[in-house]
Amino acid sequence: MGGMLAANTGGARLIRYGDVRHNTLGLQALLMQPPGELLEMGNRLHKNNTGPDWKQLFIGTAGSYGIVTQAVLRAHPLPRQRATALIVPSSLEAGLRLLQDAQAQFADFLTAFEGISRNALASVLRHLPQVNAPFDPLPDYALLVEVSSSSAASEHFDLDKLFM
């Protein structure tokens, strides 16, 4: 978690859940100056317009202002259903159109849209022999698309309609 806070990462599901900054409710940090001073930041209000949100200075700054010693993060419920596809677009433009179409059709159900290079796929296959190659030969680029919902079975997940 420390590395994620230091870099403000988002991961594969950033498109749905946001980055670490968005999901951090509170922090405790050991300040660089004055050395050793412990600062606690955050509160229980989701929206707080009473002044600067000081905890944001410590997220994504790689420890420049202090070292995060504790963090309180928002937890999201696990989806009750999920559909994932690994797709090889015919071109960069086709990949961008796919993103636009997925956003239009699935809206808030779109959970992940990630590009994966041939080198990344090859590395996975090299280091995880239990994983089967999804394509032969490996494409220059593939897209991981995921939709999910906390609801029971839904008609929103007609992936064939989008991808075929």
Segments from the language model and where they lie:
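Noncatalytic alpha-helical scaffold of FAD-dependent oxidoreductases
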Residues: M1-M164
